[in-house]
UniProtKB/Swiss-Prot annotation:
Chain positions recorded as substrate binding sites: 114, 164, 168, 286, 318, 370
Keyword Amino-acid biosynthesis on entry: no
Main localisation: plastid
Modified residues annotated as N6,N6,N6-trimethyllysine in this record: 5
Protein name according to UniProt: Ribulose bisphosphate carboxylase large chain
Needed cofactors: Mg(2+)
Amino acid sequence: SVGFKAGVKEYKLTYYTPEYKTKDTDILAAFRVTPQPGVPPEEAGAAVAAESSTGTWTTVWTDGLTSLDRYKGRCYHIEPVPGEKDQYICYVAYPLDLFEEGSVTNMFTSIVGNVFGFKALRALRLEDLRVPPAYIKTFQGPPHGIQVERDKLNKYGRPLLGCTIKPKLGLSAKNYGRAVYECLRGGLDFTKDDENVNSQPFMRWRDRFLFCAEAIFKVQAETGEIKGHYLNATAGTCEEMIKRAVFARELGAPIVMHDYLTGGFTANTSLAHYCRDNGLLLHIHRAMHAVIDRQKNHGIHFRVLAKALRMSGGDHIHSGTVVGKLEGERDITLGFVDLLRDDFIEKDRSRGIYFTQDWVSLPGVLPVASGGIHVWHMPALTEIFGDDSVLQFGGGTLGHPWGNAPGAVANRVALEACVKARNEGRDLASEGNVIIREAAKWSLELSAACEVWKEIRFNFEAVDTLH
């Protein structure tokens, strides 16, 4: 009817459009929807589309002042989740004009800002996003990317090795710098500030930066290799964060670090722009991610947070290990590792990838495997992650019975042995233990490490499975 008719009407009349053909410029989202009892899936899917785009709970006369057809989100397909009762994957298409260019913050505010508290839904999870090339082209993306990083570091043909300095809190700046020196001197490429090391009473940031820089330059002079320490620039304000990054650059440090979820996407994108303009690499830690991504029926899957990070900007990001102490199922993890590194990723539901994603030459991000890993895991990690990755052993370096430098030596020897074996055509999956044992004959440090960690297992069922 012509004219405005007040009242509440069902969302599905406006926002459920199964006949809709998606456009190349649409942002597509796959939501796992669990409706309240009695709410049909079409209504639930339409409600998600409405509340995350143009809709509100009642008809408003100002709807007549705009073109809803041009701006509304549309739920265009619904399928039940196999093996789950009352769960559906609802596909929603959003017109590109709903989003500010170059703002991950605005994209998330729109798509996941309000709708997760919606009463008609028992639970809601954003499983995947297809970001169109037209939108990706408005982002700078990673400050440098994988190839530029290798060229800066002059390291090719193998994964990079890192180590988080432990104990994570409580060391003085000088002792912290000493631990950094020992690890890098033993053969690691990087050491890392823990995510919660910012600027506390026992170690202020400026002191830490100075002692770590001293360690880096001393080791570079002694080894002839380029080294780095991820200096955590995360701070309480964006201004303070940039101030720390500026100081790192003035010291000549090669890389800084940011906690992108606790720091926020706006801060992260600002830092990424600074890093590109000033030749700093940017390491990203995902502290707080499990709050958002761990429940399999509610929240946001990490593959979406990973895509968002590639748009916002970062050169490394933590991505689970598949084999250590933290969550990560193999196929799903490899799915978002590809989304981080590759330029074009085909839809593949067996790996949790709901949409084909074209990154149109946005630089790639190195996945970082970290958490409960040690020398016995090296063959599996080398095989699973390949060359373009960073393998980080915190306790697996510093827990060595002879100290930090021998711990670093053990890891470097194990890695070189695995890469050499792989290049000779050996199968790391079946021969991994043999390869490590052979290498241990030539390295007392590796032999001691093998002995310490031969019994360690973190065996729990994965929480995040596909069904």
